[in-house]
Swiss-Prot record:
The keyword Transport applies. InterPro entries: Autophagy-rel_prot_16_dom. Residues 27-185 form a coiled coil. It comes from Pichia angusta. Its main location: membrane. Disulfide bonds: none annotated. It is a peripheral membrane protein. Belongs to the ATG16 family. The lineage of its organism: Eukaryota, Fungi, Dikarya, Ascomycota, Saccharomycotina. GO terms for biological process: autophagy; protein transport. Transmembrane segments: none annotated. Homodimer. Part of the ATG5-ATG12/ATG16 complex. Several units of each may be present in this complex. It is found in: Preautophagosomal structure membrane. This is Autophagy-related protein 16.
Amino acid sequence: MSWKNDLLAKLAQRDKSMETQKDVFLSFQFLSTRIASLERQLDTVQRDDSKKTVLDLLGEIDQLKQKLDLAEDSLKHETAKNKELVKELSTVKNNLNILTDGYKKLQERHLRLQEESKIKFQNLESLNDDILSLNIENNLLNDRMAKLKQENESLIERWMKRVKQEAEVLNDANEALSRSEKSLKPEG
């Protein structure tokens, strides 16, 4: 789940940036207050016409203005960085939403496929049972057909023997009749 880690890291970075900006704001506020105080002192000094104090205060004001400029630059930089982090966070949130939707769709598809697979497996089991029952029925019919074939061959064999015997009897009777007719006919 690296996207979660990325999101948490971006949020921590944003919080750190905000904390850094807090220090910049506080520095800016302190420097503004200090400059105002020094300017008041300068006004007081100008009234006192003390050149040395004025020069010292002007030098301090210049230093404070430089610090203030640095603080403003830092604030601008941190603000830009914060905007960038907010954009990245928005992108990460959008990506997270897209991934979440995709995950939900995949999960639904997975459940549908599992249900289809379950139904197909049940149908396959039913089909296998039907095939097994048809195989048993086929084997029984093959056994019965083999027995009937054997009985048929046996009947044909007995019938052929009987027909052969009857033919022999008829042949013998014809031969006897033919001999008796020859013997009854006068010669000559």
